[in-house]
Amino acid sequence: MKPSVILYTSNTGFTAQYAALLSEQTGLPCFSLKAAGHIQPGTPILYLGWLMAGNVQVYKEAAKKYTVCAVCGVGMGATGSQIADVRKTNALPGEMPVFVLQGGFDRKRLHGIYKLMMTVMKNTVGKSLARKPDRTPDEDTMLDLLENGGSRVSPENLSSVLDWYFGLSVSE
């Protein structure tokens, strides 16, 4: 089934940026889940949510109201990584397309428990990665994000999502 709208939940803005880029590329309207009250229940959607420990935030709420055609999780990990983990953690059906997009990290945009959790992550994972002598390029990127923050949002990261979307026929 082809989605007719993009809905998303964003915490620090990186997921919203990807949703806007997808909207530009596909021509689909795009709304935050909070602003989607006018979207009819059962509408086929492409859902984007930020990732926390493999969990696509607010996915279950979206899935209760809408027909989710595909899920994009946006996190700090490399684009295309963690797909099996995201599928398992969120109990996504095997036939549902799942995408993971690298977003970014901005400590200033975090609040409350999330700020505390990411401070702990920086102090544990960041220090562990910094000491690791044979880091992979993905680990170098993760370390850079943890230490310096920044955005890795890029239209190029959407290639798999766009290939999936434009490969669908209207009847699918």
Show which residues each predicted segment covers:
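Glycine-rich phosphate/pyrophosphate-binding loop and the adjoining helix
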Residues: 120-172
